[in-house]
Amino acid sequence: MKEPLLGGECDKAVASQLGLLDEIKTEPDNAQEYCHRQQSRTQENELKINAVFSESASQLTAGIQLSLASSGVNKMLPSVSTTAIQVSCAGCKKILQKGQTAYQRKGSAQLFCSIPCITEYISSASSPVPSKRTCSNCSKDILNPKDVISVQLEDTTSCKTFCSLSCLSSYEEKRKPFVTICTNSILTKCSMCQKTAIIQYEVKYQNVKHNLCSNACLSKFHSANNFIMNCCENCGTYCYTSSSLSHILQMEGQSHYFNSSKSITAYKQKPAKPLISVPCKPLKPSDEMIETTSDLGKTELFCSINCFSAYSKAKMESSSVSVVSVVHDTSTELLSPKKDTTPVISNIVSLADTDVALPIMNTDVLQDTVSSVTATADVIVDLSKSSPSEPSNAVASSSTEQPSVSPSSSVFSQHAIGSSTEVQKDNMKSMKISDELCHPKCTSKVQKVKGKSRSIKKSCCADFECLENSKKDVAFCYSCQLFCQKYFSCGRESFATHGTSNWKKTLEKFRKHEKSEMHLKSLEFWREYQFCDGAVSDDLSIHSKQIEGNKKYLKLIIENILFLGKQCLPLRGNDQSVSSVNKGNFLELLEMRAKDKGEETFRLMNSQVDFYNSTQIQSDIIEIIKTEMLQDIVNEINDSSAFSIICDETINSAMKEQLSICVRYPQKSSKAILIKERFLGFVDTEEMTGTHLHRTIKTYLQQIGVDMDKIHGQAYDSTTNLKIKFNKIAAEFKKEEPRALYIHCYAHFLDLSIIRFCKEVKELRSALKTLSSLFNTICMSGEMLANFRNIYRLSQNKTCKKHISQSCWTVHDRTLLSVIDSLPEIIETLEVIASHSSNTSFADELSHLLTLVSKFEFVFCLKFLYRVLSVTGILSKELQNKTIDIFSLSSKIEAILECLSSERNDVYFKTIWDGTEEICQKITCKGFKVEKPSLQKRRKIQKSVDLGNSDNMFFPTSTEEQYKINIYYQGLDTILQNLKLCFSEFDYCKIKQISELLFKWNEPLNETTAKHVQEFYKLDEDIIPELRFYRHYAKLNFVIDDSCINFVSLGCLFIQHGLHSNIPCLSKLLYIALSWPITSASTENSFSTLPRLKTYLCNTMGQEKLTGPALMAVEQELVNKLMEPERLNEIVEKFISQMKEI
């Protein structure tokens, strides 16, 4: 109710207000001022003010304020004198002070201190009392409204309330369906169509598993259960997400979309990294889905822009309504009046000391505003309805121009800041459907599922065709924002990432951005996704060709990695930049092969080289290759009847202790039995205790799928420092499987015996030290090394490079022979170089070395070492053979021992002595002096004939006797003692028992031994009848020399005569014997790859980064199998499947 004004006061008020009308500014100077003026008018129009009151010291004087009607007639309100009272705000209850302006609502006597107080008071008065909320999960009352989490789940129309995120997660786990994509081709009955077909999806919902055979059945299942279908509306492809539920979280009056409760927790964090573009994706991840909202408010999902365009074109062609009518209807709808919910303010009360004439405020309703929008085919237009926060009678109209075929070079977006004062119907142009373009509906809204929802609008601009509406009131480049951020690195381009709100020199910034490389790339990418009939019709064929091309290129990548791994070459180079002359083995080989494959492959290489050259992608491919190779080995192991493990210790470049694990097993073929020793990989060992090592080895073998019930042997590096640890490992394995015999490494024991032999005799140790100094001096000078090779014909093969390595002493016979035969010439060369050298220190070193090699003692020790090592070298080479077995090894060890024992007499010593004197005579003929041996009279020598008799202690009477006792006899006794110690401390009982049963068919059968073997190995049948048959059959049919019989040759006889099915128990014993590891040579071979694989090692890498390349370098036979077309296709498919799961 308006209060009436007195006649005289009304005239004064009218005169005072009309006098200030001329001071009102009616036209803005620029667009920014115009925008500010429009916003001010809108705010004033929402609050209609009617009267103003003024309070003096003694009374409240009512001022004047007009509510101007549409006719423009102003009515004056009289001043009303009142008694001085204390006034407070009806909203916030604050006391109104002197000079403060108060506001009064129309039809109400309550006063307010500000407009927000009025709005808040109206909202609290009009809104109903909040009802009592209950948590949908725990059923507890939610006392604090701020703790309420309202979530609209996908299969319900109403919202569910929760008291906390934990309750939301618990509720979600109870009811959400789990969708699993099936990769195995298993025929099962479909839960929807009831047909027996290959199942594509498994959906677990409410503890019930549903098998679905196709995308159509999946869509029906979702529809039947009222789920939001994550399926393409056009092609039906399932667009998978980490959770099949979609949540809408209401916070602060806004709707936020999340795919799970975990996403709600991670709200306002940085967005996830974009997925790597992977070729041949039959399934689309959710962040590549396109969500559109139709006119009716229905949400539709599409797997690609092409699917969206095809669906939109088909929908438009089927509709009988033209685009012009659509735009007209939309404009009409926007022009329709809305219900005004804005409070109307009746009075403004001024608490001033004196009466001040107030200006008349024009509160006429703002005229309808129209924003003209220009639409092209390059963007999707959103003519969304005005939000409740906009003026109630604001209208929007759209003008549409005929689109162009390609995106415009200038495509920017900005917030619409201006509105026309009248409807611009003259600018409306009819839009026809082009035969070459497929446009989406004008009212569609496009957004990413995981991204923020945003509408895309365009308004007319003189120089720039497209402008996008932004809530931030900033300008964006449409093409760069939509395409470039995901596929290119946009750096600090403001128009693509941050936008710009600084309108100074805006056109200049726009033109500069048009010429940038990022903008041109985004436009080029945009053109590939045009809504054309040709692109839609040829989409399947083009996509199929791209898939095949990408697969061929991926095969090329895998072949390169296999080849480089087989050759033990590093993939990466020191400088892999574009300008580098040598980019590394991988890039150089890839570029060369891509050129040979054709222009298309070369183009793919240039576009995807950074992707496949990344360390992570190469590691993923190597990991898949490693898995394939290990699976092949494990299949062979599990198909065999028995296997043994061979382990050695090593240290990688990160100084971490590792174990090299190999397996030995027999493999039956059509004509023979092959002995396979395969390398399985390196395993880190945190502790070097027996229990921990046993657990580490067993865990690794079980992880890769080895059947541990078939283990029948174990061998380890038996050096002195590791012997105790490996004995504990063997004991742990024998607790679980007593038949896993501990067979020591014979190669290591032979090496230990030779080392002790060379170190325990003083003269031999001194001679080897002099020999090492000689080779070190020769290698120091290239000229000296060339002279030695040319003069004495010492090839690199005859000169052992590892002369100072203890592990190479067993094969020093070749080196010793080279030095012995050429010693006079070596001494002569040293003399010449020492006399002509300008370096005095080097000359002194050569002179000292010349004195040492010219001694009789040095020559004698060389002759003696060669005589011993030349015999033990035969056994050392035999132990490196993978086909060696216990039976043949025992005879060879006995032969070595017999040979060395038989030479412990004066005859063989005299042979060495005479040979030494002959060489010294040759040196003397060259003009050099040889230092003769001297007799050490005070040294006691103990005879070896009777070690317990102290009377045998004597002094040698001659130099020859001294050399015979001190060097020759003592050296032979040392080597014989060590060999007997090493090869006699093992328990050969079980091994010899099987050897006797299989090889000694001409001797009487020992049934007690046979029964013991049967019980120990838990054979299923009685072994005695098989042995009786086998012995008679072998006598009549096996024509073979007893001296060359071994387990391998016996296995060939079993296959030739078909005895495996006749005597299964004996055949099993034969396979067990073939699996026994006599040596860990294969493990040593794996160690030889480490120096060549140093590129793959760094301080942060463990065995996972090393096992893959080492497998390719050691198991080259398996690498060749992986290069077959079928196996390559399997690796390609596994890599693609792995990339989808990222």
From Swiss-Prot:
SMART domains annotated for this entry? TRASH (SM00746)
The record lists the membrane-crossing segments as: none
**Biased composition, class Polar residues, residue ranges:** 385-396
**Residue intervals of every MYM-type zinc finger in the record:** 110-148, 160-203, 210-245, 300-331
Superkingdom assignment: Eukaryota
Molecular function in Gene Ontology: protein dimerization activity; zinc ion binding
Report the InterPro entries cross-referenced here.
Answer: DUF4371, HATC_C_dom, RNaseH-like_sf, TRASH_dom, Znf_MYM, ZnF_MYMT-QRICH1
Q: Which GO terms describe its cellular component?
A: nucleus
Q: Where in the cell is the protein located?
A: Nucleus
Region annotated Disordered, chain positions: 385-413
User: According to the UniProt entry, which residue ranges have a biased composition of type Low complexity?
Assistant: 397-413
Q: Where is this cross-link: Glycyl lysine isopeptide (Lys-Gly) (interchain with G-Cter in SUMO2)?
A: 25, 284
Residue ranges annotated as zinc fingers (TTF-type) are 452-538
Major place of residence: nucleus
Q: Which PANTHER family match?
A: ZINC FINGER MYM-TYPE PROTEIN, ZINC FINGER MYM-TYPE PROTEIN 1
Listed name of the protein: Zinc finger MYM-type protein 1
